[in-house]
Amino acid sequence: MARGYPMAEQNITFSRRTLVAGAAGLSGLALAQRATTRDELVKLPPYGNGTIGSGIRSRLIDNVNGLTVHILEAGYETPGRQLVYLMHGFPELAYSWRKIMPVLAAAGYHVIAPDQRGFGRTIGWDPSYEADGNQFRILNMTRDAIGLVYALGYRSVAMVVGHDAGAPVASWSALIRPDIFRSITIMSSPFEGPPALPFNTANGALMPRPPITDDQLDAELAKLNPPRKYYQNHQRTRGANDDMLHAPQGLHNFFRGYYYFKSADYKGNNPHPLKARTAEEMAQIPHYYVMLKDKSMAATAAEAMPPADYIANCKWLTEAEVGVYATEYGRTGFTGALQGYRVRRGSDPVSLAEMRTFSGRSIDVPSQFIAGKSDWGVYQTPGVAEKMQTTACSKMVGFHRLDGAGHWVQQEQPEKVSELMLEFLRKYGKA
């Protein structure tokens, strides 16, 4: 049974001091690594701390592949609308779509954005570091998506959208179930397609050379001067959660520095295609992806902390909005959100084997790609952006890199992103 608590009916204002204090006070739950109960969820302050428009409501959906899923929802008032499904990345939340949802709803769509498994107010997943990886592998995350669509009474989705870590979930959903997910917008993280099984080897074809693993890349990065390391390897470690949750600069300032570092406002972001996945080439990438070996992620974000005048005048991410992320992650910690790094195909043989089941398949529904021109996520894995456009997506109709945006493109340039989505939906979004 789906239950809701509409935001429009909430009228509570939070000061920054309240937000920060609340985050600190609630962080004990994360420390205990204890699963939040549904009763505890419904007693929490309203989602978004008053920073979300009245046309968006917050709602809990039970019995979704073992989860109680928290969603933001817009355009729900009118029955029979086509569904648009938005998947966030890391370290984000359903909240990251707050600027996009009202525009799509005003155009006549029913728009949903869940807190993904491991994030925010969605519960039912194991919050411990030792959690069974199966619950966070891509096929189970795809089942989460299908289960939510069905729970809402739909058989198809006009457009699924995935940003950052949400991009592979959206991509695999569209590849595996094109009957449900009728078109896709991939954002910031290009889709490489399924890993290939060896072909024609019985007739003399050579086995393909295996790609360099993250561990092999890390070993080469460590030889550089100064030594470096790949961020995904760091994020798989047990200490990654505490590093960010208890950042010396405070959780609020961690988010401010991290979001700024990967945005177009940080002038050191000048992404371009790399020749190969070698240490020398990868060393061109900023420290948030190819970190200094002796620095944590919290220290990496601290090195990019913007000045006070920038913070006071930042329109795309206000202090109150940063406070929403700090409050939610202060309550949950990062462990669940980090589990995806541990079961990505490059580091997890079980995931690799599962994905090879789909060797030779492509996304065959209409697709487009959107990213900021200042987003290194497009090129951090050499060759993938090109492969997405030639083989991984058979109906790629647009590859868009937007001025004035870095990694957080839907928050930095929501008007441009919404315009591209609506144009795409008008042409291809027939559920």
Q: What spans do the regions from the language model cover?
A:
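Conserved HGGG/HGGXW glycine-rich cap/lid loop of the alpha/beta-hydrolase fold
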Residues: 72-125, 163
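N-terminal secretory signal peptides and thylakoid transit peptides that target proteins
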Residues: 5-26
